């Protein structure tokens, strides 16, 4: 049997809606642990059950699917037997959210989505991302959008590019694109990004060598 882990940064709708349409959860031979640095396992289970049962979803996923297990984040980190180091850092986002760093065999991936970048975060973020292979950065906005979107909990593409200059990282992927941005607009943005930075897209896979 295989085991997979799903780490939730937070439970805003755009981060949980895909769970009920993930084919792996309906495979009884695939054991899946769900965890979050934001919620204890019982609270996480209760919230997921609310979203995926009753009026919101035809199946009660937490009761129906026996291959889904909820694990306290710090127990997941401590009990990990696969030589994988998982760390968390709180982001600047309404309702709270967490970023994650995952290191295995000296390869490091950092997830920093849903964060409204502020200068006071710089030192902690640099330390968190030091010697990383890939940073996944929240680039929902352009710099000119930031004034009107203060408090929305997201960063800009340009802020990501500036941060990339300050941290020891091989590659940055920009995610959480603004919903109104068209594919052609994203293609144009992608063509203008500095070396080492590109836009992430659905279905993208990256092999860290």
Spans of model-derived segments:
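Active-site glycine-centered loops adjacent to acidic/histidine catalytic or metal-binding residues
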Residues: 10, 114, 176
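Acidic active-site catalytic centers that drive phospho-/nucleotidyl reactions
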Residues: 14, 114, 138
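Cap/insert and terminal regions of metallo-dependent hydrolase folds
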Residues: 117-204
């Amino acid at each position: 049997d295989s085991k997979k882990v799903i780490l939730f940064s937070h439970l805003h709708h755009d981060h949980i809606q895909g769970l009920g349409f993930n084919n792996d959860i309906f495979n009884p031979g695939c054991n899946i642990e769900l965890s979050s640095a934001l919620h204890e396992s019982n609270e996480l289970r209760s919230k997921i059950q609310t979203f995926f049962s009753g009026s919101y979803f035809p199946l009660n996923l937490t009761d129906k699917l026996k291959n889904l297990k909820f694990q306290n984040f710090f127990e997941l980190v401590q009990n990990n037997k696969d030589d994988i180091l998982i760390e968390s850092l709180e982001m600047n986002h309404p309702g709270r959210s967490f970023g994650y760093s995952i290191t295995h065999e000296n390869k490091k991936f950092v997830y920093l989505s849903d964060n409204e970048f502020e200068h006071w975060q710089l030192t902690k973020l640099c330390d968190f991302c030091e010697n990383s292979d890939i940073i996944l950065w929240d680039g929902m906005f352009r710099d000119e959008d930031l004034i009107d979107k203060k408090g929305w909990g997201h960063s800009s593409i340009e802020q990501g590019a500036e941060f990339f200059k300050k941290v020891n990282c091989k590659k940055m992927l920009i995610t959480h694109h603004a919903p109104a941005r068209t594919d052609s607009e994203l293609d144009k943005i992608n063509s203008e990004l500095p070396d080492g930075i590109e836009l992430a897209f659905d279905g993208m896979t990256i092999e860290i060598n």
